[in-house]
């Protein structure tokens, strides 16, 4: 599952996640498109924010989606 589908499957938009994180939608887009990988701390923050929005996800799930996005972006 790609990052866009992951968020959609949870019923959460990038804008909602950005608001919960206190960052811009652009930051979220960069992370979820694989253009730039978030730090470990930010993956934790993303996981926490998603759960606060009702997504019921684990750190490992979020890390995997973000990692796959990064690998797809790099062409691996």
Q: What are these regions, as identified by a protein language model?
A:
Residues 35-48:
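Short, basic-rich loop-to-helix N-cap that marks the start of a DNA-contacting helix
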């Amino acid at each position: 599952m790609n990052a866009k589908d992951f968020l959609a499957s949870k019923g959460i938009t990038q804008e909602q996640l950005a608001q919960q994180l206190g960052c811009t939608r652009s930051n979220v887009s960069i992370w979820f498109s694989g253009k730039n990988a978030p730090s470990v701390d930010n993956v934790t923050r993303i996981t926490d924010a998603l759960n606060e929005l009702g997504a019921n996800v684990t750190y490992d799930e979020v890390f995997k989606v973000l990692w796959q996005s990064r690998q797809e972006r790099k062409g691996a």
